[in-house]
Design a protein with these regions (language model features):
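Conserved acidic
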Residues: 5, 47, 73
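His-Asp-centered metal-binding catalytic motifs of divalent-metal-dependent phosphohydrolases/nucleases
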Residues: 28-46, 51, 55, 78-85, ...
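Juxtamembrane helix-loop transition sites at the ends of transmembrane segments
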Residues: 46, 59-60, 123
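Divalent metal-dependent phosphate-bond-processing catalytic cores, especially two-metal-ion Mg2+/Mn2+ enzymes
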Residues: 1-26, 37, 65, 69, ...
Length: 137
């Protein structure tokens, strides 16, 4: 999968996450960084179970060089990145917002987002997000 395809995915995740994050009062800096970093260490779009762990390590390396997160923010970002592919749900507004943004773009791999894995604030975005994923922008 080329960088162009990944850039479109990251942009859609960022778009969805920011909309939901504002409604949920999530930490938007963490949400935005998640959008760019969560799949940055993927080796392919198929099975790559360690890509989240690698991306969380990258986030730690980039902190203080390219962005300034407080320790709790960095922990939240790294947890969200590490566990974003597992199908978990979180009561933490920022973590769930990150996961919502990524899950709303599952249409790019032929999967319709399931409301049971999304916050209630994400539910109204499913149809639009699916259309965006299928169109590729």
């Amino acid at each position: 999968m080329g960088w162009y395809t990944w850039a479109n995915h990251w942009a859609r995740v960022l778009y969805h996450s920011r909309q939901i994050g504002e409604a949920r009062q999530a930490d938007l800096l963490v949400v935005e960084l998640f959008g760019f970093l969560h799949d940055s260490c993927r080796e392919n779009d198929g099975k790559d179970p360690k890509h989240g762990v690698r991306a969380a390590e990258l986030a730690k390396e980039l902190n203080t060089q390219f962005f300034e997160l407080k320790p709790k923010q960095l922990d939240t970002l790294c947890f969200a990145i590490t566990h974003h592919s597992g199908g978990d749900v979180s009561l933490d507004a920022t973590i769930q917002t990150c996961w919502d943004g990524d899950r709303l773009d599952l249409g790019r791999v032929g999967i319709t987002p399931s409301p049971q894995y999304l916050s209630k604030e994400a539910h109204p975005h499913i149809e639009t997000a699916l259309a965006m994923s299928i169109r590729g922008h």
